[in-house]
Amino acid sequence: MEITISNKIYIKDFSNDLLNWAEKNLTIVNPKWQTLKRIGKEETIIRCHIPEYIKIYSIKGKTLTLPFGCLYGIWKFIKSEKIDLKLNDSDYEISNKNIPTRIELYDYQKEAINNMVLSKGGVLVSPCGSGKTVCGIEIIHSIGKRFLWLTHTGDLLRQTRSRMKSLYPELDIGLITEGEIHIGKDGCIAAVQTLANVDIDEFKDYFEVIVVDECAHVSGAPTLVKMFQKILDSIPARYKYGLTATPTRSDTMIKAMYAYIGLSKNGEFEPTYKVNKDNVKTMVALHEKIDIPFDIDFSILNSDGTFDYYNLINYISNNSKRNDIILDNICKCQQEGRKQVVLCQLVSHCETMHKKLLERGIKSELVIGKTKNKERERVLNSPEEWDVIVSTYKLLKEGVDVKALDTLHLCTPQKDKATVVQCVGRIERLCENKKQPIVYDYVDIKIPYCERKYIERKRNIDKRY
């Protein structure tokens, strides 16, 4: 048996034990098939040829190919047999350039960075507000090799580059984003959407360290999954790291994140290191339930009596009396001098709430997907100019760092655990003279679905991650 470790792991003349390991661990139930099956859409499954399983390994002739991150998973097979192991690069050792660190790290950050560097890869799980970006930057600094930092939003890209340049101004950091491809001497920060659509072969051997910010997206929405996996499969970097606060999914696709980035040192599909939330210096938000007492309109139900989630969101978003309850509470918080963020599921709901707040004399800012980058940066960097930001869950959950925020209004019943936890984390940042952070959760108590989702949110907020 011969194993070559490059952009992927290539195993020639593989054993039955290795094949069994791949079949067991790298065959994942297709979440799309699972959803359609659950709601009785067998005809769609057949018509669209949707497979029940997704395999993240392949066999061609006598060669078994695995994602690079599976190395620790198959290490026991490498040790147990006489194997010809080949690395297609000559340098797999850490070579710090002796650039002194300029970051005053907390003890929990030092421990996390040390563990990740010694592991030479894997997933770091660290709570919102714990300084994941700082940890990623210091991992790169400790290894001292050319890096590629992958992110999926323009906000995260700009924030990361600004943070790196402020800490290490002597580094030549390139950018790969829409309308700009500049390969820096020391590394690059790249938007995954851009990098996935250029010829990666031109510089695939240039980078030796990859850091995937918010790496849960490696196993998230299908479009992003394909982009991340194409890049990770193409670049033979010896050090691949992932950063996330919420390594959870309701299905088994999370295994793909570990397979492509790195299993733990004991070969399990779990984080390489997990920061204890009790060690993190943040302010813990209170969680207050606001009862919404209105009766349900049964027209939002499906014919079988079940809820249609999107009809439900439309219904409660357009309920003016319900909105007035939320607006009254926002005004009360404004009189207390709070810095608030109001989250809605629908852009139209955001626009309605923003307009109503302005009519009440509240200094409100609307930040949605179509908000231009320059305007968004102005809002996020000037909290003294506003009382309230109105935005969507999707936009706030990643890439927003306004330490002054202390109040969160959950206007609609968000059901995704990761989204809720990340949004709560946005108001728990430490800031001088900050008020006690508080989450207002508006719950339609006469709609059983909404009450159940509130209980789930409360449990997830209490546990954090």
Residue ranges of each PLM-predicted region?
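Conserved SF2 helicase motif VI
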Residues: S126, P247, K415-K435
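Post-DEXD/H (motif II) to motif III coupling segment of the RecA-like Helicase ATP-binding lobe
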Residues: H217-V284, I461
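A short beta-strand element within the Helicase C-terminal
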Residues: V400-P413, Q422, I438-D441
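Conserved segment of the helicase C-terminal RecA-like domain
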Residues: R426-I455
